[in-house]
A protein has these predicted regions:
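Short alpha-helical segment of the dimerization/phosphotransfer core of two-component systems
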Residues: 9-14
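Conserved micro-motifs of the catalytic ATP-binding
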Residues: 29-34, 73-76
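Conserved catalytic submotifs in the C-terminal HATPase_c
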Residues: 35-40, 57, 62-72
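Short helix-loop "hinge" at the ATP-lid/N-box region of the Bergerat-fold HATPase_c
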Residues: 92-93
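Short beta-strand/loop element within the Bergerat-fold HATPase_c
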Residues: 99-111
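Short conserved segment of the HATPase_c
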Residues: 124-138
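Conserved glycine-rich
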Residues: 165-166
Length: 188
């Protein structure tokens, strides 16, 4: 039974790698089209938080959704932005500390909305920040075996946001936590 469980986990991991590689290859081709529309980012983030509630609870991590914006409507490809939020929240939980928090926050910045995903997890060393969004790059290769993932999530986030003419930013301190942030245009 133990062998079957390991095999099943390996198959799931391979499926995730293939799916992530497919996403990356589509993002890098001219075939990639954004379906830009106005949508409620707060509702979308609530759905993402709900999807991770059980995983966060199992790891004793509290999820918080904080809206400090006067509006909730942004312009973007809703499905792609959902993938961005899923990847960032998932990483925040995976690299979080027992009893820690993951916060998804929204701020008004003139014609844009600033979206932040912050945690009080293990943090990232400054010398790793430049390579963080490269395919398959893992900050702590020894620890990442236990954590799982494909090493493609942040590369996907970067490509999606670049296709929205936006950037992903990161601030991090080892043993203090990380904050990933990006802008989306507000809907009029």
């Amino acid at each position: 039974l133990k062998y079957l469980e390991r095999t099943n986990k390996s198959v799931d991991r391979m499926i995730n790698i293939v799916e992530d590689l497919e996403v990356i290859s589509r993002l890098e081709t001219d075939e990639y089209q954004l379906d830009l529309q106005a949508f409620n980012i707060f509702e979308l983030a609530s759905e993402v938080i709900d999807a991770f509630e059980m995983k966060a609870s199992q790891m004793n991590i509290t999820l918080e959704l904080i809206n400090e914006s006067q509006t909730e409507l942004v312009i973007g490809d809703k499905d792609k932005i959902q993938q961005v939020l899923m990847n960032l929240v998932s990483n925040s939980i995976k690299y979080g500390k027992d009893g820690g928090k993951t916060r998804v926050r929204f701020f008004d910045m003139e014609a844009n909305m600033l979206i932040e995903i912050a945690d009080d997890g293990i943090g990232i060393a400054e010398d790793s920040l430049d390579r963080l969004f490269e395919r398959f790059y893992r900050v702590d290769k020894n620890r990442s075996r236990d954590i799982g993932g494909t090493g493609l999530g942040l590369a996907i986030v970067k490509h999606i946001l670049e296709n929205h003419n936006q950037n992903i930013n990161v601030r991090s301190t080892v043993s203090v936590g990380s904050t990933f942030s990006f802008f989306l245009n507000k809907a009029d």
